[in-house]
């Protein structure tokens, strides 16, 4: 296999990553919350997570705040220019427990864990351009 060199890769925006591993929340429920923040600005994503009713929004919010802090402290980036570039949830190990049932039976309980990863990217702020035609303007 040969690796192709991409010209746009040289001009990539700086990125910072934060991971939380072995979080005691099911990956399926965490993915629901992560989908809310993909592609949003970091400040907007934190606001969305603050008011999200899901229990998984707490750990996801902490990971996002950590990624923003990593960008600010390690890469000297402005927090106002940060966007959620990638966010995903991987499945961690499952703790297996048993619940005793009637007549000597036992049901298995699976306590699932997640690995949450959030990657923020610094994008330059866009300057508002003047529109070509303005309503009601004298020509």
UniProtKB/Swiss-Prot annotation:
InterPro entries: Ribosomal_uL22, Ribosomal_uL22_bac/chlpt-type, Ribosomal_uL22_bac/org-type, Ribosomal_uL22_CS, Ribosomal_uL22_sf. Residues 125-139 have a biased composition (Basic residues). One of its GO terms (cellular component) is cytosolic large ribosomal subunit. Pfam families: Ribosomal_L22. CDD domains: Ribosomal_L22. One of its GO terms (biological process) is translation. PROSITE patterns: RIBOSOMAL_L22. Disulfide bonds: none annotated. GO terms for molecular function: rRNA binding; structural constituent of ribosome. Keywords: Ribonucleoprotein, Ribosomal protein, RNA-binding, rRNA-binding. Residues 118-139 are annotated as: Disordered. Part of the 50S ribosomal subunit. Belongs to the universal ribosomal protein uL22 family. This protein binds specifically to 23S rRNA; its binding is stimulated by other ribosomal proteins, e.g. L4, L17, and L20. It is important during the early stages of 50S assembly. It makes multiple contacts with different domains of the 23S rRNA in the assembled 50S subunit and ribosome. This is Large ribosomal subunit protein uL22.
């Amino acid at each position: 296999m040969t690796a192709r060199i991409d010209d746009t890769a040289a001009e990539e925006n700086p990125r910072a990553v934060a991971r939380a591993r072995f979080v005691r929340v099911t990956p399926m429920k965490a993915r629901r919350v992560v989908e809310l923040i993909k592609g949003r600005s970091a400040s907007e994503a934190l606001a969305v997570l603050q008011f999200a009713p899901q229990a998984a929004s707490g750990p996801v919010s902490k990971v996002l705040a950590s990624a923003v802090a990593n960008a600010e402290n390690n890469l000297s980036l402005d927090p106002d220019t940060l966007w959620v570039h990638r966010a995903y949830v991987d499945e961690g190990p499952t703790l297996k427990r048993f619940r005793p049932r009637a007549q000597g039976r036992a049901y298995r309980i699976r306590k699932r864990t997640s690995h949450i990863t959030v990657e923020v990217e610094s994008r330059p702020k866009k300057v508002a351009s003047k529109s070509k035609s303005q309503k009601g303007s004298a020509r």
